[in-house]
Regions:
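C-terminal GPI-anchoring signal of eukaryotic secretory precursors
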Residues: 511-530
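Extended, alpha-helix-rich binding/interface surfaces that flank or overlap catalytic cores
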Residues: 188
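Residue-level signal for pocket-adjacent positions within structured domains
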Residues: 262, 535-537
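N-terminal signal peptide
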Residues: 12-26, 538-542
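Compositionally biased non-globular segments, especially hydrophobic aliphatic-rich helices
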Residues: 8, 47-49, 521
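Sec-dependent signal peptide recognition
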Residues: 3-11, 528-533
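Extracellular zinc-dependent metalloprotease catalytic-domain scaffold
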Residues: 19-183, 191-516
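Positively charged n-region of N-terminal signal peptides that target proteins for export
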Residues: 1-5, 541-542
């Protein structure tokens, strides 16, 4: 018992969880204004009105950001680079019908924060949407960004919006640009489509519905394409909608997916180490009636995949045990893989002062998991002071060497590695004793589509995992490795990495949805030092 306790204690003390993002969209949004005369059709316009579609284009106006001069020049340049990466992703994902130039007679009417702007916005810019980024020193702690649309065209599509970025964003972490790109994808989606103020302008009149689920009144999106792709993803033919977030108060509720069933999608209200762009979010773009959508990133979303209607309708944990072991956990601080098998982490549970009856899953009514997931316990990736999501198996930066020799476990971080549960220890390593404890380990894999098996590298040894997964022994090692099912990790051609890196770096022609015909192509969570002290004292007395 002491050995196991010491193992978890060392893990806990070596890695800190620094999730601090909370979206502030609903705190700044105002009902957008329709401008019937905002589109200019003239002989100089390269986008004369017709019925064809083209990749969405952005006019980014940095005038206000440069005028305010908040943050360092390095930070402002960092933001510009991240925005360029972000709009490239949207250019691959979305097409809009051609229009003329966009002319906004009163750009400052977009927000009281906008006092300076490019004069061409008033005369007309030959783009599909105008976006004004602003570094804002007034955003509250934990809110890294917020965004909103402000003007709509005569066909109700957003044509101007702004995004606020926290002056104190930690942009010097190793993979900070990837994280900010993820953040900008989220915020700009609020400008383009995902806002309860925009739902009123969708092509369908009944975008949302209200139902009681597990004793709680919920608001759900029920548009046709969302229902279709969600039914396929979850394996539930009778699905009636996808829930919107009901927690977090102003800023989160109503304009985000419910994290309990959409954890890992980029449109939940808080950051998570496996943010991807799901088919379900892409379907919302299509259902608006404003966009033609490329669905190539959606296969990367795996939370709740194939779990059936029960996943949508029942609780995550019953009588202290997870109802869905791939997606929820039930043992506090257990070293585990996150649900997409991309990150190493631990089962997040804690003691609250009190919990509502419908969020009580354990014998101790105060025990719960992560608040944004309806207090369900989920696996959270490790982070460090210098690296976002350092537990990632593709490009993580965890210094485990202080704990043990990684080669003894066949561990490998690479572009094609995933996280796999394993108790394997090299039988020739006399420095380690075998206790049978299962750990989250990174292993390089190859998906074999011909027979739906997975080749897993364990040190110099390669094993073949069967289609349905399961426990396997490995020559030269004590213990077993728990192979994941083929369909869980190999269903997408870009089966490793998140949708951001896939969108930026991995877009072979065969991965593009043929129907798209693309052209060239909050809750703030920080560990309190008191909790750490209690944790240490607990293990000292085991």
């Amino acid at each position: 018992m002491k050995t196991k306790a010491l193992y978890y204690l060392i893990l806990f003390l070596n890695f800190s969880l620094l999730f601090s993002f909370k979206c502030g969209h609903d705190k700044i949004k105002k009902p957008p204004k329709i401008l019937n005369d905002s589109i200019i059709i003239d002989d100089d316009s390269t986008r004369k009105l017709d019925d064809s579609y083209h990749s969405i284009s952005f006019f980014i106006d940095y005038t206000q950001m440069n005028y305010n001069a908040y943050g360092t020049s390095d930070y402002r340049n960092f933001i510009k680079d991240s925005i360029n990466s972000t709009i490239k992703v949207f250019g691959e994902l979305l097409k809009v019908k051609r229009s003329g130039k966009i002319s906004i007679s009163n750009p400052a009417g977009c927000s009281e924060r906008i006092t300076r702007y490019d004069s061409s916005i008033k005369t007309g810019v030959d783009y599909d949407i105008i976006l004004i980024p602003i570094i804002d020193p007034t955003l509250e702690d934990g809110v890294d960004a917020a965004a909103s649309a402000c003007y709509l065209s005569s066909d109700n599509r957003p044509i101007m919006g702004y995004v606020l970025l926290n002056q104190n964003y930690s942009y010097k972490k190793t993979n900070a640009q990837q994280f900010l790109t993820m953040l900008l994808l989220h915020e700009i989606t609020h400008v383009l489509v995902f806002s309860d103020d925009l739902f009123d302008y969708f092509q369908y009149s009944d975008v949302t519905t209200t139902q009681t689920i597990n004793g709680i009144s919920r608001t759900l999106i029920q548009t046709p394409k969302v229902l279709s792709v969600a039914s396929q993803h979850f394996g539930c033919s009778s699905i009636t909608g996808i829930e919107l977030e009901n927690q977090g108060g102003e800023g989160s509720a109503g304009s985000h997916w419910e994290a309990r069933i959409m954890l890992g999608d980029y449109m939940i209200s808080t950051d998570y180490p496996e943010i991807v762009i799901s088919d379900i979010s892409l379907a919302l773009f299509e259902d608006s009636g404003w966009y033609q959508v490329n669905y190539y990133t959606g296969g990367l979303f795996r939370f709740g995949k194939g779990q059936g209607c029960k996943f949508l309708e029942s609780t995550c944990v019953s009588s202290g045990e997870s109802n869905f072991e791939w997606d929820f956990c039930d043992e506090s601080y257990e070293n585990k893989c996150t649900s997409n098998n991309l990150n190493r982490g631990f089962c997040y549970m804690r003691i609250y002062s009190s919990l509502p009856a419908y969020y009580q899953y354990f014998s101790d009514s105060r025990t719960g998991g992560w608040e944004p997931v309806d207090y369900c316990p989920v696996t959270m990736s490790y982070s460090s002071s210098s690296y976002y999501f350092s537990g990632n198996c593709i490009n993580g930066e965890i210094d485990d060497t202080k704990i043990y020799n990684l080669s003894s476990f066949g561990f490998k971080i690479s572009d094609s590695s995933i996280c796999i549960q394993s108790s394997l220890i090299n039988s020739n390593d006399n420095s380690l004793s075998y206790y049978g404890y299962e750990r989250a380990m990174c292993h390089k894999i190859t998906c074999n589509s011909s027979d739906k098996t997975i080749s897993v590298d364990i040190g110099e040894t390669v094993i073949e995992c069967p289609t349905d997964g399961g426990y396997m022994e490995v020559d030269g090692y004590n213990g077993t490795i728990r192979c994941p099912p083929y369909d869980r990790v190999c269903t997408s051609k870009t089966y490793v990495g998140d949708s951001i890196s896939a969108a930026l770096n991995h877009i072979p022609n065969e991965d593009i949805d043929s129907s798209y015909k693309a052209s060239s192509g909050s809750i703030t969570m920080k560990f309190n030092r008191i909790i750490i002290s209690i944790f240490i004292l607990f293990f000292l007395y085991i």
